[in-house]
A protein has these predicted regions:
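Amphipathic, small/basic residue-rich leader segments at the start of a protein or domain
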Residues: 1-119, 127-151, 163, 458, ...
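Glycine-rich phosphate/cofactor-binding loops in nucleotide/flavin-utilizing enzymes
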Residues: 3-23, 273, 378-465, 559-625
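C-terminal helix-coil-helix/basic helical segment that borders enzyme active sites and/or dimer interfaces
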Residues: 60, 302, 329-359, 372-374, ...
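Glycine-rich phosphate/pyrophosphate-binding beta-alpha loops
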Residues: 112, 188-194, 395-400
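Extended, hydrophobic alpha-helical segments in both membrane/secreted and soluble proteins
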Residues: 125, 137, 150, 185, ...
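A structural signal for short hydrophobic beta-strand segments in well-ordered beta-sheet cores
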Residues: 170-173
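A short core secondary-structure module
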Residues: 179-231
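Glycine-rich beta->alpha junctions and the first turn(s) of the following alpha-helix
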Residues: 230-328, 396, 403, 412-418, ...
């Protein structure tokens, strides 16, 4: 049976194959691959630490002022931190994905708001021009972005279109005078949007497909001095308050033809590839946050004495400490593997990027939540920083694609391989003599599955890791079988069975995290010897054991009757709640109507009133010079 043509560890895992060569051997540290780049990364990290020590970067100040001040941005520009993803040919540092991820993690550890600013500037806006810009666009805009003379932005999200990026409503039509494109629409939550001098945005354009005119997204490079561009205001937020998100208005904004990014009608490809880089950034930032927060967790637990002993001496605290450490180790392993995959243009790492983003963001949220819980009342109030950590962590599950949507993205893409195989099988069954080879191959696969034969890692693991490798192989086979069964059971309706697809994604995510963890730990053992890797082995063993247990729980829900029964009950209750607009039963103590919350109207005026747009300051950073 065939698998997806583009190499992808997860796509092949769904199809019952373990593409060991895509993860093993784990990529060596950067200083062994590129000593010169490693030295650059060290210099940048040292500059970041110096900025934090001197007060140039001050998370508390940024949070209270609700902006990153110009002094910090200038310091970043002077250090070269605004050109890390831009090739050297255009004045940047041209870091690899690995180097970029390491620097971005350091930025996130210093201040999450600055990480958002840098991520939007380098990882989204600048990266899209690097990947898809014409040579003229690159020459025109990348040097200024690399020097930090202006900031970059990435304007995709709209008031009515968040994760459903393919269905944006901003329209682009041809200018009657032939000067280019006229864009009309609004963009929401645009990081750096109020002071960026170069922005990448998206609009629906009419294109010909199969003899009919249809609307497809196109990417454009725009500037705030284009006629029709307006910043409606900036937005106050729960967390990452130092970063600024703006609402932009395009009122028949004129964009020249030479500012189309990529091809007309193929903007979705631009968005997806830029978001892969953005998801790497986010995962790297969350991994760094996990390391920093674990340090704070440990220090507080050792210092805080209750019942005559430090909190760190209690088993419940130690359980939390160990789980945070193991999950951070796994996240770090995923970031290293993903960065290496994104450096290989022949590899499709879109599913892996989505999994890393989901896993990392949820790890960071749990870690921040546990730190607040550990600190008790101090975790909830200022001037202690713990409540800010929690507020800053919350957005990660929404940025770069909401986690619920990314789970569906992973699950639905994963079942495409089994679906194609089963479609091929169905055709063979209609004409069995003409497709004897297909039937024989499918029968052989089923017989092998029944006999317990399965794809293997095909790499030597140290004996201490081997049991976890064998568990991985068993559960990889279970994922492939569950994906095939889901397609056979639900057929075309599988795309609507989101609870099933979500579980498949959770299984895949656990396996990917575990494979990365095993690969990295095996690499460390090979380099240092088992005697020098005791802590890493303990982390890997703990993570693999906990991950395998989570896998078994989800797999039982997916393949047993219990999960289907619970799903039916959930959908029935949800239907009743929807029909009544909320909670139905009478109050158990005394049935007294609750006060109604303020109405959230759906009109544009009501939304703006609810959000409370703040008039945007005049940009202090000039656009194109």
């Amino acid at each position: 049976m065939s698998t997806a043509a583009a190499p992808s560890f997860l796509r092949q895992l769904f199809a019952g194959e373990i593409a060991s060569d895509l993860l093993f051997p784990y990529p060596p540290p950067l200083d062994r691959r590129d000593p010169e780049e490693a030295e650059t990364v060290r210099r940048l990290c040292a500059a970041l630490n110096a900025m934090a020590a001197s007060g140039v970067v001050d998370s508390r100040r940024f949070d209270e002022q609700e902006q990153v001040d110009e002094g910090a941005i200038r310091a970043f520009a002077e250090a070269g931190l605004l050109g890390i993803s831009i090739p050297r040919a255009y004045g940047g540092l041209g870091l690899s994905a690995t180097g970029y991820a390491r620097v971005f993690g350091a930025v996130a550890a210093v201040d999450p708001s600055l990480a958002v600013l840098v991520g939007v500037h380098c990882g989204l806006g600048g990266k899209a021009i690097v990947l898809y810009g014409s040579e003229a666009l690159k020459q025109r805009y990348l040097p200024a972005l690399a020097r930090g003379e202006t900031l970059g932005a990435y304007a995709l999200t709209e008031p009515e279109t968040g994760s459903d990026a393919a269905n944006i409503v901003t329209r682009a039509e041809r200018d009657p005078e032939g000067r280019g494109w006229l864009l009309t629409g609004r963009k929401h939550w645009i990081g750096n949007g109020h002071r960026a001098g170069v922005l990448v945005t998206f609009a629906q354009t009419p294109v010909e497909r199969d003899g009919a005119t249809v609307l497809r997204p196109t990417a454009f490079v725009i500037r705030p001095d284009f006629p029709g561009f307006q910043v409606a205001g900036t937005i106050r937020k729960l967390g990452i308050r130092g970063s600024t998100q703006a609402e932009l208005v395009f009122d028949r904004m004129l964009v020249p033809d030479d500012h189309v990014l990529g091809e007309v009608g193929k903007g979705f490809r631009v968005a997806v590839h830029a978001l892969n880089a953005g998801r790497l950034s986010l995962a790297a930032g969350c991994a760094a946050a996990g390391k920093r927060l674990l340090g704070e967790f440990t220090r507080y637990a050792e210092a805080r004495v209750q019942f005559g002993a430090p909190l760190a001496s209690f088993e419940v605290t130690q359980r939390k400490m160990a789980t945070i450490a193991a999950e951070t180790y796994a996240t770090d392993a995923m970031v290293g593997a993903l960065a290496s995959a994104l450096e290989n243009p022949a590899v499709d790492a879109s599913l892996e990027a989505a999994c890393a983003k989901v896993f990392a963001s949820e790890m960071a949220w749990r870690t921040a939540d546990e730190l607040v819980q550990l600190a008790g009342g101090r975790g909830y109030v200022q001037p202690w920083p713990y409540e800010r950590y929690l507020r800053d962590a919350r957005i990660q599950r929404i940025f770069e694609g909401a986690n619920e949507v990314l789970r569906l993205f992973v699950g639905l893409n994963g079942v495409q391989g089994p679906a194609a195989e089963l479609q091929e099988l169905a055709q063979a069954l209609r004409r069995p003599l003409q497709h004897l080879g297909t039937l024989t191959g499918y029968a052989a696969e089923r017989v092998a599955s029944a006999l317990g034969q399965r794809a293997g890692l095909e790499v030597p693991l140290h004996p201490v890791l081997r049991p976890h490798g064998e568990a991985f192989e068993r559960q990889a086979a279970e994922l492939a079988a569950a994906a095939a069964d889901a397609v056979m059971t639900h057929r075309r309706e599988v795309v609507h069975r989101q609870l099933v697809v979500e579980r498949l994604a959770d299984l895949a995510m656990e396996l990917y995290a575990r494979a990365c963890t095993l690969a990295r730990t095996q690499q460390l053992i090979g380099e240092r010897g088992i005697g020098a890797c005791g802590h890493e082995v303990a982390l890997a063993e703990l993570f693999c054991a906990q991950s395998a247990r989570r896998f078994r729980t989800v797999h039982r829900e997916l393949t047993g009757q219990g999960g289907a029964t619970v799903d039916r009950l959930r959908l029935a209750v949800a239907a009743a709640v929807r029909s009544q607009g909320g909670y139905l039963p009478a109050d158990a103590l005394l049935d007294v109507p609750l006060p109604s919350p303020p109405a959230w109207g759906l009109s544009r005026e009501a939304q703006e009133a609810a959000v409370g747009l703040v008039p945007a300051p005049s940009p202090e950073v000039a656009p194109e010079r």
